[in-house]
Amino acid sequence: MASKQTFLQHLQSHYQAKLDRDYCTFPDADAASGKSAQLVLLNHYELLEVQGTDSERFLQGQLSCDVREVSMDSARWGTYNNAKGRMHASFLTSAAPDVEAGYHLRMATDVATHCREVLAKYIVFSKAEIQSLSDEWLVFGIT
């Protein structure tokens, strides 16, 4: 995963961050507090992107959350369930920052492929597309 290493090395060289495997600790901005910020790679999450003119309508009919409430300032938790109500995946839905009519679904990596395949069966009837962003995006947590 060259992109992860390149990004972490950039943080190290430009922000004096200390690297430790998938953790990145930043110098203390307030030495008196004794606290420092830490960036943690959440490689157990993957992002799926749904984009296109019908993306909102498609997702509104497939997911448990109200996609109309998702904005750049507001994400929503949701699930994707089968016809019998069994949950395939739970995720956090957010607006895609670089796509006008798009959404990101952050979910566990072990269910992302299955969820993408199932949603792809139905998305062909909409003016929307779904793709994995695992090769382009990394998911980090900040402590």
Predicted features and spans:
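Basic, glycine/lysine-rich polyanion-binding surfaces/domains
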Residues: 1-143
